[in-house]
Regions:
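Absolute protein N-terminus
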Residues: 1-2, 105
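Short, well-ordered alpha-helical segments enriched in acidic and aromatic residues
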Residues: 12-25
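Residue-level detector of alpha-helix boundaries and kinks
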Residues: 2-3, 25, 29
């Protein structure tokens, strides 16, 4: 389903695939950050180009997925520190409509 394709797109740094999964009205929300689809894609492009996104340091666990929504738990290894985040996805027209992210350590 969508989460598997999303994970593949992130792991392979495939912006074309990621963009195709996002609804035209997609919004990304993380704490006080709000990005449109265009802003999110541009931000990921910068992270991929600069090497600040490293899939080898990330473990992704699919918590659940239905036709309307899904959730991932993502664990990022930074040296001796583990950063854990929850990412909830809401779907519309079989695309990612909203992504809500909450970090915790």
């Amino acid at each position: 389903m969508l989460l598997q394709k999303f994970s593949e797109g992130m792991t392979n740094k495939d912006l074309q695939l990621l963009d195709s999964l996002l609804h035209e009205e997609m919004l990304f929300l993380q704490d006080t950050i709000l990005e449109t689809k265009e802003q999110w894609v541009k931000d990921m492009e910068i992270q991929f180009e600069k090497g600040t996104f490293d899939a080898s340091k990330i473990d992704v666990i699919t918590k659940f997925e239905t036709k309307e929504m899904g959730a991932l738990e993502i664990i990022i290894k930074e040296g001796d520190t583990l950063l854990r985040l929850s990412s909830v996805f809401l779907y519309k027209d079989d695309k990612i409509y909203r992504q809500l992210v909450k970090y915790s350590s």
